[in-house]
Curated annotation (Swiss-Prot):
This is Protein bfr2. GO terms for cellular component: nucleolus; nucleus. Belongs to the AATF family. Residues 93-106 have a biased composition (Acidic residues). Residues 1-10, 19-34, 43-57 have a biased composition (Basic and acidic residues). The modification Phosphoserine is found at residues 31, 36-37. Residues 1-141 are annotated as: Disordered. The gene is bfr2. It comes from Schizosaccharomyces pombe (strain 972 / ATCC 24843). The keyword Mitochondrion does not apply.
Amino acid sequence: MGKVSLKDELAGMLNPQPQERDPEALEDAFSDREDSSEEENDTLGREHYVDVSESKLRSKQAPQLDPKFKGRKTSRQELLNSGSLNSQSSSPSEEEDSEEDENDAVSEDHENFSSSEASSISEENEDDDQSSAIPEKDMDRLKKIINGEKKLSDQIRTSALEDMKKGLALKEQMRFYDNVLDTRIRLQKGCSQLLSSSNQLQGDKVEARDGLVSFIQHTLQLRKNLLIDSGVEILDSRSKRKENPVSLEEIALEMNNLDDSLNEWKNDTLTKWHNRVQAVQGISQSNKFKALNQSIVQQIENSMINKKDLVERTRIDYSDPNNKTFNPEIYNDTDFYQSLLKDFINSRMADSTRDGTVRWMATKKQKQKKENVDTKASKGRKIRYHVHDKLQNFMAPIEVTVWPDEQTEDLFSSLLGQQLDLSETANDTNTSNFVEKDDELISSNDGFSLFG
């Protein structure tokens, strides 16, 4: 920037519309040389780069605007006058005139539209009307959907309540079964002793028979009531004149009739629940022909094929191991009791999570597992060694003691490259040597005497 004369400076101060200047332009004028040197230093490392032209997007200029959008210069007085005029409230007539002008402008704009634009606008308006009318037409369908969802949620809630009731009923049934099984386990000792003392109860047969018949009658009546509640039709072949069976033949006939009446319902119920259990467990089709994966009815029929052998096994007195004869007067259900006891223990082992049970299972597995013993490693034929674990958090001990003189001398001799003697005798000899040397220096000064 060149030097400005006083006349030009005064003229610029009196000008109401002074020329705008960039305050940073002065700094740029003085920093041209520095920038050029910095640019040269920056380009030193990029001399081997390939020259690339500037992007077209960067060189693209802004579109040419209409001259009416360009601004014009104004003075501060005109700006204040225009602001005061705009702040004043307009009269109602002026507002009406402005509204009329706006309406005229809008009508003129509509007249300038083409026919295609007008048709497109009309179609859009029709679409908006149709879209606004759609919810009204579909309100019934939405209500049906909402009602259906509400019914579905109610069904899910009721099914969840039913499943909860079934679970509680099953839990109560298992508790009742456990109590009956516990009672049977407690009675096993007494039942086993009855076999050995059967010959001593000859005089009490009548009383025992009457009590047994009464118990069977109550049991048969309970079975009938349960079958009626389950909707099973009972086959009755007895005479209507007799209320309860008295003889053993009548009791056996009544029990057979109840079994025949229950047979069809029993098979259907067992098959239904067996299929549900198989579906939950996910048994594959390749294993369905195995004995354990067949239908429960088929498994029962297969187990009852040798019914005669099963009955004969219940007529053996196991209290006498030497006696293998069949006694029709006894009934020994030891095998059935052992199977029940095994199932009971397995269920307790599966359901229990106590530490004692887990510890007992671990001990049992250790006993069953065979130890891997090398028989050829005896008599020193093979070296036996044990690999120790790696040391963790280990550090050699540090002795906190004072260094002796020898160690200090070694340190200084290694650092300074000369031998030093730090003992008291060495210090005395060193001082005496220094004194003798000083005396020699004082005495021999080429004939000059320091005193006299």
